[in-house]
From Swiss-Prot:
The gene is nuoK. The chain crosses the membrane at residues 4-24, 28-48, 60-80. It is an enzyme of class 7 (translocase). InterPro entries: NADH_UbQ_OxRdtase_chain4L/K (IPR001133), NUOK/Mnh_C1-like (IPR039428). This is NADH-quinone oxidoreductase subunit K.
Amino acid sequence: MIPLQHGLILAAILFILGLTGLVIRRNLLFMLIGLEIMINASALAFVVAGSYWGQTDGQVMYILAISLAAAEASIGLALLLQLHRRRQNLNIDSVSEMRG
């Protein structure tokens, strides 16, 4: 069995990597990938904690996180396609530019 600390450290590292990708990158696709990594890291923390205490609540939260990630991915990819269709690039800064 993997110790609780190792699983939580791995989840924290993954969360920080996802947060870094979300903050640093300006491409919408890479921002969505960073957000997915963050959601999966939090789901991993739930599973590790639930396994440590012998409860199934962590697995239930994992299923909830996966369904949330699927909904987020479908909406995010729809926005990504519309942005690419209208602006011909995926730079998130081009969305904030207003036409005058």
